[in-house]
């Protein structure tokens, strides 16, 4: 399973660590990530609020699940963007 984690803080670090322990996780990406997260995931230089670029990345890299860790993208509607493209995403919708 390919996983994309959106964010760059302590919450996303904990998520990356947890996902890395799963035998089902073949590849983990984090956007934008940080040096600590890079121990567990490949960091991608896409900002957490760049919804279209993140969704494009998920499609192009055949991401099986995207986990949204940061609050601002959730409030901004990132889950709605991913779902509108048929992408699997974990997080609440904007409305």
Question: What residues fall within each predicted segment?
Answer:
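ATP-binding N-terminal substructure of ATP-dependent carboxylate-amine bond-forming enzymes
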Residues: 1-95
């Amino acid at each position: 399973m390919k996983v994309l984690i959106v964010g760059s803080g302590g919450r996303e670090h904990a998520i990356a660590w947890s996902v890395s322990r799963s035998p089902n996780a073949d590849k983990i990406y984090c956007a934008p990530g940080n040096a600590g997260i890079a121990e567990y995931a490949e960091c991608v230089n896409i900002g957490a609020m760049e919804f279209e670029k993140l969704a494009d990345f998920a499609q192009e890299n055949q991401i099986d699940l995207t986990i949204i860790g940061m609050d601002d993208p959730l409030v901004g509607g990132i889950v709605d963007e991913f779902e509108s493209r048929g992408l699997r995403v974990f997080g609440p919708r904007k409305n």
